[in-house]
Swiss-Prot record:
The lineage of its organism: Eukaryota, Viridiplantae, Streptophyta, Embryophyta, Tracheophyta. The gene is CLE13. It comes from Arabidopsis thaliana. Residues 1-25 form the signal peptide. One of its GO terms (cellular component) is apoplast. Glycans are attached at N29, P102. This is CLAVATA3/ESR (CLE)-related protein 13. The modification Hydroxyproline is found at P99, P102.
Length: 107
């Protein structure tokens, strides 16, 4: 009997506190606080700044062009002509050519 009273009181306090927080959130915007006509300017970080926990300086603008591959040059093999297609007896579909070589997802 005493535990049900305690649970009812705690539930009542929970609902009241929730109601207070919601009412402050909804009606807190209509308070009579003065609006600042001159907001503070946005602070921008320089291009070279120090990140704590790192030994090196982090550069925001970095030129990645030396690392980009030349799009005109291709290291991939040329596609073989589609003359020798075989049917897989297990699945009854055409066998696919599986590329060989290192996995491109691993460096």
């Amino acid at each position: 009997m005493a535990t049900t009273r305690v649970s009812h009181v705690l539930g009542f306090l929970l609902w009241i506190s929730l109601l207070i927080f919601v009412s402050i959130g909804l009606f807190g915007n209509f308070s009579s606080k003065p609006i600042n006509p001159f907001p503070s300017p946005v602070i921008t970080l320089p291009a070279l700044y120090y990140r704590p926990g790192r030994r090196a300086l982090a550069v925001k603008t970095f030129d990645f062009t030396p690392f980009l591959k030349d799009l005109r040059r291709s290291n991939h093999r040329k596609a073989l002509p589609a003359g020798g297609s075989e049917i897989d007896p297990r699945y009854g579909v055409e066998k696919r050519l599986v590329p060989s070589g290192p996995n491109p997802l691993h460096h």
